[in-house]
């Protein structure tokens, strides 16, 4: 059975998760933000995913979530992505943001599996808000799926933007069809340094229809950390990355079609490190090609 190494395990075993802080200043360089194509509103380019990390509504999880959200904000971030199907994540997020009075500081995105008005009502109640910033149709699988109801809700002020999501390459044909026809404000897709299928299809189409792109599972569900276990960050990468986490995120942000990356974490130190990917230079096309070659050589 293969040994599974989490990011926490990796950080401990590496004995030095971060490269020297002199490599890249984390606070005195401009924050990387990206414009939402349909509105030109700018949002910070690193957010927070909540799948599997905030799914239990208990005191321990709420305390952890509060620390992570505070780390996101301190790092310059605003975007938090959740879903009605992520266990108790909406409830945890709602309680944490309400208790700390953080709602107006955040860009909240959630997802529904279908245009069900009652499920929307329950999501808003769990999030303790009357409006979300982004409402997404989750896990698009059919070319016939529509955003008609979502647009109605947008017109009613329930959300500011609408989007679609998928993390399955077999569903890309359906995603492409809905993206072309519905022209949503956002598409959320699986995209990582070792999973680049979206570069050939979804990203070009998103640019064509002026949809923002959110990248889910940017660490490939932990695959990338397992690949680099026991390896030091190459010297050539230290000009733009302070850690392996930033290396992986900055590959994605090096593509200007990507609006934001949304790695999930329940660890505030990892959130701080993730937010650091919004500081300092991004890799240029030649450096991105070298990053691909490096990962493919492992």
Can you say where each PLM-predicted feature lies in the sequence?
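N-terminal binding-site loop/beta-alpha segment at the start of enzyme catalytic domains
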Residues: 2-104
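Structured C-terminal cap/extension of enzyme domains
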Residues: 17, 201-298
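Short amphipathic alpha-helices and their capping/turn segments at secondary-structure boundaries
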Residues: 30-41, 124, 200-208
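Generic structural signal for well-ordered alpha-helices
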Residues: 33, 69, 90, 94, ...
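Conserved, mostly hydrophobic/aromatic
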Residues: 36, 48, 80, 93, ...
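A cross-domain feature marking catalytic cores of carbohydrate-active enzymes
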Residues: 47-52, 82-84, 110-112, 136-139, ...
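Glycine/proline-rich, positively charged
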Residues: 57, 114-188, 192-197, 201, ...
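Short, electropositive alpha-helical surface patch
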Residues: 94-98, 107, 273-280
């Amino acid at each position: 059975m293969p040994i599974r190494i989490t990011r926490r395990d990796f950080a401990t075993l590496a004995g030095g998760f971060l490269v020297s802080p002199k490599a890249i200043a984390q606070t005195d360089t401009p924050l990387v933000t990206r414009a939402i194509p349909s509105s030109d509103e700018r949002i910070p380019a690193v957010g927070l995913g909540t799948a599997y990390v905030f799914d239990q509504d208990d005191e321990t999880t709420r305390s952890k979530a509060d620390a992570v959200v505070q780390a996101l904000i301190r790092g310059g971030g605003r975007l938090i992505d959740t879903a009605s199907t992520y266990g108790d994540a909406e409830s945890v997020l709602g309680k944490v943001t309400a208790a700390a009075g953080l709602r107006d500081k955040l860009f909240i995105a959630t997802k529904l599996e279908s245009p069900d008005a009652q499920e929307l009502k329950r999501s808003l109640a769990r999030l303790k808000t009357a409006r979300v910033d982004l409402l997404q149709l989750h896990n698009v699988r059919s070319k016939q799926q529509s955003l008609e109801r979502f647009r109605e809700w947008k017109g009613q002020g329930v959300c500011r933007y609408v989007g679609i999501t998928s993390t399955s390459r077999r569903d890309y044909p359906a995603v492409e069809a809905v993206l072309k026809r519905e022209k949503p404000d956002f598409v959320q897709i699986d995209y990582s340094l070792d999973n680049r299928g979206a570069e050939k299809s979804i990203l070009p189409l998103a640019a064509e229809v002026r949809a923002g792109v959110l990248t889910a599972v940017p660490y490939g569900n932990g695959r990338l950390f397992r690949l680099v276990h026991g390896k030091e960050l190459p010297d050539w990468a230290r000009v733009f990355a302070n850690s392996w986490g930033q290396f992986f995120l900055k590959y994605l942000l090096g593509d200007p079609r990507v609006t934001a990356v949304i790695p999930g974490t329940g660890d505030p130190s990892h959130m701080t490190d993730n937010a650091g990917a919004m500081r300092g230079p991004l890799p240029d096309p030649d450096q991105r090609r070298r990053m691909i070659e490096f990962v493919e050589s492992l």
